[in-house]
């Protein structure tokens, strides 16, 4: 009888431990962000990605134009940094909603880009004054991927 009570207590403790253990969270996505060492808004964008579940590695470079060129980002569509996520190029201060769409749809493009440094975009100061035009990067003519 005493052994059965001890066994019941042990089973209860094991059940409680299993029930209270946290479920495994989704693994963070890796992102590599290339930026100019002097750019603070790019650090803000890296923090934005981290706060939204990305594991971000920041690479400082004085030759961002070459990195953009190597990844197929046309000169007129370049943002102030380039991020690689799951094999896609993500140029500039693109909102998370658009990145999630890209990663879920997995289109046959090189990536997406938000040219320049628009006010009110993630990581940028100021108020959003107009919709963000986010372009596809790939072969062919310039095409809008999303408007935010």
Which residue stretches match the model-derived regions?
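N-terminal secretory signal peptides that target proteins for export/translocation
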Residues: 1-2
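Short beta->alpha connector loops
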Residues: 38, 62, 116-118
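Local sequence-structure signature of Cys/Sec-based thiol-disulfide redox active-site neighborhoods
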Residues: 26-47, 51-52
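Bacterial N-terminal signal peptides
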Residues: 6-17
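Thiol/selenol-based redox catalytic cores and closely related redox-interacting motifs
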Residues: 70, 76-148
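N-terminal, post-signal-peptide region of Sec/Tat-exported proteins
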Residues: 43-92
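Sec/Tat signal peptide C-region and signal peptidase I cleavage site
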Residues: 18-25
